[in-house]
Amino acid sequence: GNAADLLLLPEAYLTGYELPISNEEALSDDNPYLKQICNAARELQLGVVVTAFTKGVERPQNSAYVIGKNGELLMKYSKVHTCDFADEACLESGSTFRVCDFAGIKIGIMICYDREYPESARILMLQGAEIILVPNDCGSMKPRLCALSTRAYENMVGVAMANPNGENAGSSCAFSPICWDNNGICVDNTLLMADDMSEGLFYADFDLSAIRKYRESEMLGNTYRKVKAYEPLLFGKITYPFLRENQSPID
């Protein structure tokens, strides 16, 4: 074997990315598929991040489950930034970002469109995340790969993304936060970069000891932020040119 600790699967893995879907059709947290994956995780001593459209309060949610090596459910996270400009307008957004402890490592989740907003990774970093995992299902990946590398750099967290293969898609990847060596010389922080068409299992190795040492000494993450200047980030008003037909200016 390859001695993997955790398997990251793409977005909506158990249900398929087929929308619209009703709350009745969405999976409950005690669905048999999740139980089977928990049993397999325990048998293989392998953590798993698996995804599905799940039952929400009124509408389905786009969710990820983090399963520990002993088959225990460590965390459920529901996508905050649903794609309200597309088919996901039928979904219910999650309300909070979450971090869990996986074998002594703090893990956070962003699902697909969450990664388009730097606030997602920033909040996970503030909550203690050391590694951010990104179940994904979309194309036009080139600028998004650059963004994921930047999220790793600016928050001093490892980032890994799993995306279904296909033309202009795929590109499952992983990035280290370590972007320069002890002498200040820039290093390539890319740990994994798959092509768009290859299908299979891809492996990335995060050196947690090196990452933790780096985080203790460098000046990014939550070191010298000037939070008093960030108040506009909390303003909900949407104005031109960002206001869309299905939005209210006070959303």
Language-model regions: role of each:
Residues 1-76, 122, 138-155:
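Cys-nucleophile CN-hydrolase/nitrilase-fold catalytic domain and related Cys-dependent amidase chemistry
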Residues 5-6, 107, 131:
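Structural motif
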Residues 13, 70, 116, 197, ...:
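A generic "binding-loop/recognition-motif" signal
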Residues 14, 83, 209-210:
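Active-site/binding-pocket entry motifs
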Residues 30-49, 116-203:
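CN hydrolase (nitrilase-like) catalytic-core segments centered on the catalytic cysteine
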Residues 55-127, 136, 140-150, 154-157, ...:
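Active-site catalytic loop in hydrolytic enzyme cores
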Residues 99, 164-251:
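C-terminal beta-strand edge segments of enzyme domains
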